[in-house]
């Protein structure tokens, strides 16, 4: 291939990014893909030296970890030189909530000034981009003191973005901040007034539910509900979902299955919370626990560890997401006539997903979960061919 030929001529490959930690679990891929160095963490203070060493033909380290004390200051983070993917614009780095499964909370909180954000918006605008994704672990604490929202900073930020972009989205917000900022400041109302216009009438965002269990929340993410007590975490989640539903904010929510010390009562609590969220427009995506952050010494959760309650959570998430996915697609997404072919393809895809989901449910019911986990070959049932 061209890359292998270039490697023979001295090409060096340095990789990084948010998922760089995954290379540590598949070191065999380093040789397969010819990777010379993996940078795990914020790279601004190390990448120039690595590039210089590569250009000079010097030996490169296999792995570079950038710890919390070595992250760049805002002044050391350069403005982007070319258009970003999907119009992504960073507004801050770090997170103060301290969830034990998340590596971002290990890094200090730093806010980009509006002047720096505007320069990146201008780079994207010059490239013809008309949309923007504001990137942060929690957009609603931009400019905050601790976890206390700063309405003035947020309103100025969104007003600035709408000056350059027709549409915007949020990469992440926390559910506690959605509820608190609306209850205390009516901030979601005010932001909607700034954002919604002839070009945009909804916002997409990723949020983290992670678990419906108060017991687990207390152990692994005690500040996730702050400023509310963690004991009312399910109520915080439901109220935030209600606020987002009323304001046409569409969350893609994550759940984590297989958290350390997870028991049947925790999964039952998650199922009960999912029942409470049925009426709120959202996508809910379950994930298996991956050892990161303060829990990086724990074991991965694997398919072989699934039990009946895990399967019930997976099923409930799947049908919730399919049902609301159809609603979102028909009422909010790709409404322009020119997107009709794409919309039709998505409808066909959802129909396929529903058919395969029903087939999978039948297989588990007929064969039993244990046989499916062992990887027993699954032959289509007569009903699945209809």
Regions found by a protein language model. Give the residues of each.
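Glycine-rich beta-alpha loop elements in corrinoid/cobalamin-binding modules
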Residues: 1-70
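Well-ordered, non-membrane alpha-helical segments in soluble/globular domains
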Residues: 1-3, 114-118, 148-161, 184-192, ...
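Surface-exposed amphipathic alpha-helices with a cationic face
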Residues: 2-10, 103, 162, 241-245
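Flexible glycine/acidic-rich beta-alpha junction loops that bind and position SAM and/or redox cofactors
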Residues: 20-26, 133-146, 179, 209-224, ...
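Catalytic cores of alpha/beta
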Residues: 24-33, 186-188, 260-276
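N-terminal pre-triad scaffold of radical SAM enzymes
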Residues: 70-105, 111-114, 118-126, 130-133, ...
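Radical SAM enzyme core and accessory elements
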Residues: 95, 315-386
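Conserved SAM/AdoMet-binding glycine-rich loop
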Residues: 122-251, 257-259
């Amino acid at each position: 291939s061209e890359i292998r030929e270039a490697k023979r001529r001295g090409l060096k490959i340095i990789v990084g990014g948010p998922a760089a930690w995954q290379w540590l679990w598949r070191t065999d891929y380093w040789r397969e893909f010819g990777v010379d160095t993996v940078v795990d963490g914020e790279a601004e203070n190390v990448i120039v030296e690595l590039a210089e060493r590569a250009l000079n033909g010097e030996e490169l380290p296999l792995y570079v970890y950038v710890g919390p004390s070595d992250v760049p200051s805002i002044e050391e983070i350069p403005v982007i030189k070319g258009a970003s993917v999907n119009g992504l614009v960073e507004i801050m780095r770090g997170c103060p909530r301290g969830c034990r499964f998340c590596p971002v909370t290990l890094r200090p909180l730093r806010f980009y000034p509006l002047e720096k954000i505007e320069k990146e918006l201008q780079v994207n605008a010059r490239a013809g981009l008309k949309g923007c994704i504001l990137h942060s672990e929690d957009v609603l604490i931009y400019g905050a003191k601790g976890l206390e929202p700063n309405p003035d900073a947020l309103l100025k930020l969104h007003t600035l973005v709408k000056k350059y972009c027709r549409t915007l989205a949020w990469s992440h917000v926390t559910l506690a901040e959605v509820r608190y900022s609306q209850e205390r400041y009516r901030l979601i109302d005010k932001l909607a007034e700034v954002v919604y216009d002839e070009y945009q009438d909804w916002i997409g965002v990723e949020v983290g539910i992670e678990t419906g269990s108060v017991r687990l929340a207390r152990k692994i993410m005690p500040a996730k509900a702050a400023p509310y007590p963690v004991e009312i975490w399910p109520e915080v989640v439901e109220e935030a979902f209600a606020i987002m539903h009323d304001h046409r904010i569409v969350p893609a929510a994550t759940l984590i299955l297989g958290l350390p010390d997870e028991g049947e009562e925790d999964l039952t609590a998650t199922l009960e919370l999912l029942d409470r969220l049925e009426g709120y427009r959202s996508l809910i995506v379950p994930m298996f626990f991956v050892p990161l952050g303060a829990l990086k010494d724990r074991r991965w959760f694997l398919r072989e560890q699934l039990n009946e309650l895990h399967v019930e959570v997976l099923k409930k998430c799947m049908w919730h997401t399919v049902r609301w996915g159809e609603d979102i697609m028909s009422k909010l997404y790709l409404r322009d006539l020119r997107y009709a072919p794409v919309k039709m393809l998505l409808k066909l895809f959802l129909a396929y997903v529903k058919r395969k989901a029903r087939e999978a449910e039948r297989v588990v019911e007929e064969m039993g979960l244990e046989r499916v986990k062992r990887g027993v070959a699954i032959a289509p049932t007569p009903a699945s061919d209809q």
